[in-house]
UniProtKB/Swiss-Prot annotation:
It comes from Drosophila melanogaster. Induction: By mating. This is Accessory gland-specific peptide 95EF. Keywords: Behavior, Hormone, Secreted, Signal. One of its GO terms (cellular component) is extracellular space. Main cells of the accessory glands of males. One of its GO terms (molecular function) is hormone activity. The keyword 4Fe-4S does not apply. This protein may be a precursor of secreted proteins and peptide hormones. It is found in: Secreted. The keyword Secreted applies.
Length: 52
């Protein structure tokens, strides 16, 4: 029973270390944003419909 717990703890440690090493190799600050911001300008018709 103790060996099973040890085995699961070892798997958890390996998974955590792989996760942190992947985060170090691929920092989120340099990664592309999922949704790129676009310059959206309202047309005159849209402004009129917003104004009522």
């Amino acid at each position: 029973m103790a060996s099973v717990k040890l085995f699961f703890i070892a798997i958890l440690v390996v998974a955590l270390s792989l996760n942190t090493s992947a985060a170090v190799l691929n920092p989120s600050s340099t990664a592309k944003p999922r949704f790129e911001t676009k310059d959206r300008k309202l047309s005159a018709g849209a402004l009129q419909s917003l104004a009522g």
